[in-house]
From Swiss-Prot:
Cellular-component GO terms for this entry: periplasmic space
Function noted in UniProt: Part of a binding-protein-dependent transport system for a sugar.
Name of protein: Probable sugar-binding periplasmic protein
Domain of life: Bacteria
Signal peptide limits: 1-22
UniProt entry tagged with the keyword Transport: yes
Main location: periplasm
Species of the source: Rhizobium meliloti (strain 1021) (Ensifer meliloti)
Subcellular compartments: Periplasm
Length: 414
């Protein structure tokens, strides 16, 4: 005797299948939209797909993630948070304080994250003792990227002091190329300022940007930092305003500019253009910052989701922290692994240098969260500094005025 399923039973099975597919899916909000960034993200997508987890992409263009955070706020307010969100530093802790993030303790304990993720990163990956985010990488921000052909034509070596840097920029100008490829956006201005302040001393950087000491923020050394920004401003082109960072990288890649001050995510653009470290471009620390590293760390903050979606979320977190993925992803991204036990075998010369520099800075106490990239202080303080730095860089304030404004702006934002 044939048995037929009722319409109700068929509908129930279809709903169950749909729910199962939804549970095996992760929706990911991020701002990795440049060529090099997208190539790196594809490593994670393919890794998850191999584990049977589908990926719903939610890219929001805009370096630094400001636009992405606006979209996220709207989603969370509507009660429809993504599974995971690319996030930086204090932004993660701000969401944790709101009670919006999930708990990764189960997978973190099972895989021993506490032992392999540097303590400097854990302060942003954990809240109230609980793991809330999975760190993907460590980017260091005090890098200089130099066109090797332009450097050779200048007959110069890699500059190690401020004076040597200025001499090199003058030689680039003589070649008829733009000395500094720069994008006039507040976070890019602040990235340069970050390195300039660090070049004036580790203690000074800590006092100014981590301790927020008014004496450091308002002293003669800070005036010198702003004076140096004025000098660097004279080496950018007239069309720098609003330029995206990856377009500035392209200027160096295409021999239209001599160098760029940018974090090591810039290397991904060089690699995507088939350029080779040491042959086509040079990677070095900003003069005066050798032995020190300012960092930011891309992390995926895991938001509270329905219970049926938690297993896929935990699998995503586990995949992110696996040593094999950490190596494969960071080789493409230009960053270094967010765990200390990943060998540097597959990394190029710049990657090996980045891993070595990070380890040494971590050991020597010269590893600092980057002010410009939200790892030194909360967003309100960072944005207050951005405002003063950009106004000074664009000639709206002289150095003396900028120092006075900086002290007042930071005090008001604290």
């Amino acid at each position: 005797m044939r048995k037929f399923m009722t319409t109700t039973a068929v509908a129930a099975l279809m709903l169950a299948a749909t729910a199962a597919r939804a549970a095996e899916n992760v929706e990911v909000l991020h701002w990795w939209t440049s060529g090099g960034e997208a190539a790196a993200l594809d490593v994670l997508k393919k890794d998850l797909e191999s584990k049977g987890i589908s990926w719903t992409d939610m890219p929001v263009a805009g370096g630094g993630g400001t636009e992405a955070m606006t979209v996220l706020r709207a989603r969370v307010t509507a009660g429809n948070a993504p599974t995971a969100v690319q996030m930086l530093g204090f932004d993660i802790l701000d969401w944790a304080k709101e009670g919006a993030l999930g708990n990764l303790d189960e997978v973190a304990a099972k895989e021993g994250w506490d032992k392999v993720v540097p303590a400097a990163l854990q302060q942003f990956s954990k809240y109230d003792g609980h793991w809330i985010a999975a760190p993907v990488n460590v980017h260091s921000t005090n890098w200089v990227w130099i066109n090797k052909a332009a450097l050779d034509k200048a007959g110069a070596k890699e500059p190690t002091t401020w004076e040597e840097l200025i001499a090199l920029l003058d030689k680039f100008k003589e070649q008829g190329i733009t000395p500094i490829a720069h994008g006039g956006q507040p976070w890019q201005d602040a990235t340069i300022f970050d390195a300039v302040v660090l070049s004036l001393g580790n203690d000074f950087y800590k006092q100014a940007f981590i301790d927020l000491d008014p004496a450091a923020l308002g002293g003669d050394k800070m005036k010198e930092a702003f004076d140096r920004m004025t000098k660097l401003r004279s080496y950018v082109d007239d069309n720098f305003s609003g330029r995206d960072w990856n377009l500035a990288s392209a200027m160096v890649i295409e021999n239209k500019a001599g160098l760029q001050f940018m974090g090591d995510w810039a290397k991904g653009e060089f690699l995507k253009a088939k350029k080779v470290p040491g042959t086509d471009f040079v990677c070095m620390r900003f003069p005066g910052t050798q032995g020190s590293v300012t960092f930011n760390s891309d992390q995926f903050a895991m938001f509270k989701v329905s219970e049926d979606k938690v297993p896929a979320q935990l699998q995503m977190a586990s995949a992110i922290e696996s040593p094999a993925f950490q190596s494969a992803f960071n080789v493409v991204k230009g960053s270094v692994p967010a765990r200390t036990d990943v060998p540097d075998t597959d990394f190029d010369a710049c990657g090996k240098k980045g891993i070595k520099d990070l380890a040494e800075a971590n050991t020597n106490g010269t590893l600092f969260g980057s002010m410009a990239h939200g790892h030194a202080n909360p967003a309100a303080v960072k944005n207050a500094i951005y405002d003063v730095v950009t106004r000074q860089f664009n000639g709206e304030l002289n150095s003396e005025e900028a120092v006075t404004e900086l002290v007042a702006a930071v005090e008001a934002a604290k």
